[in-house]
């Protein structure tokens, strides 16, 4: 198994696909997706285009759908939800499909949607993602960070490092043996330095600071936790993620 890290969707190769692709948007799309499914949501369907989201979701009964839209960190007008995982309570999402479009995370998922196995990872469900990789042993794994509008992000990189670090710790393989590119080595180093203060790292990240200015302090606290949700969001059909059954 070789892990490759791409800091933004635009950096992924266009002439091939991996056996397994993992989209990461710690702040906050993949954290929200994991939370919705852990709270009993039927599925999460992702869109890059808001108009397309509205068109598709209109075909669902009102009581069976929720619309989540975020642009620039703020909720899209007319949608029930923005991109805060803390809003996704079991009382709200149980049995419903979440139709979601965000600034960055949904683009990452759409970029890798043709891979045989597509997962959504965040710090909060890291262990479930790692267990899938250890069980399935895919030959090539792409971890694709969402970044922020095409730029590198600390929070997605440290999550990739958390995944790679856990695989390193649970196998007899060295970091050099599991790393397919230098980005993985640097991500492991970042996680190793900050693993005991991930909230502090998120506070230093540019998108973390952006969310703090929007008074999303509790979101950062929640998203900085590791392994609190035993849920694996996996693509069942193009653009539709459901919880992997145990």
UniProtKB/Swiss-Prot annotation:
Pfam families attached to this UniProt entry: 2-ph_phosp
Keyword presence, RNA-binding: no
Record field: catalytic activity: (2R)-O-phospho-3-sulfolactate + H2O = (2R)-3-sulfolactate + phosphate
Protein name as catalogued: Probable 2-phosphosulfolactate phosphatase
Entry keyword annotation includes RNA-binding: no
Organism classification: Bacteria, Bacillati, Cyanobacteriota, Cyanophyceae, Nostocales
GO MF annotations in UniProt: 2-phosphosulfolactate phosphatase activity; magnesium ion binding; sulfopyruvate decarboxylase activity
Domain of life: Bacteria
């Amino acid at each position: 198994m070789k892990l490759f890290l791409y800091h933004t969707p635009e950096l992924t190769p266009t002439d091939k696909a991996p056996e397994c692709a993992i989209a990461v948007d710690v702040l906050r799309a993949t954290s929200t997706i994991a939370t919705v499914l852990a709270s009993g949501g039927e599925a999460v369907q992702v869109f890059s285009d808001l108009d397309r989201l509205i068109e598709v979701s209109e075909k669902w009964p009102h009581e069976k759908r929720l619309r989540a839209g975020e642009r620039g960190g703020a909720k899209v007008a007319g949608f029930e939800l923005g991109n805060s995982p803390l809003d996704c309570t079991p009382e709200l999402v149980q049995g419903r499909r979440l139709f979601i479009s965000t600034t960055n995370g949904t683009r990452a998922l759409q970029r890798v949607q043709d891979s045989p196995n597509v997962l959504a990872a965040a710090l909060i469900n890291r262990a479930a993602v790692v267990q899938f990789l250890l069980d399935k042993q895919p030959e090539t794994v792409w971890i694709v960070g969402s970044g922020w509008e095409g730029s590198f992000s600390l929070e997605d990189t440290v999550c990739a490092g958390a995944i790679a670090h856990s695989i390193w710790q649970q196998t007899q393989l060295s970091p050099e043996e599991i790393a397919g590119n230098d980005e993985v080595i640097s991500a492991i180093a970042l996680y190793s330095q900050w693993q005991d203060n991930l909230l502090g790292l998120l506070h230093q990240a540019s998108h973390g600071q952006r969310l703090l200015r929007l008074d999303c302090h509790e979101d950062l606290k929640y998203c900085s936790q590791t392994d609190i949700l035993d849920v694996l969001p996996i693509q069942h059909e193009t653009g539709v993620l459901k919880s992997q059954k145990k």
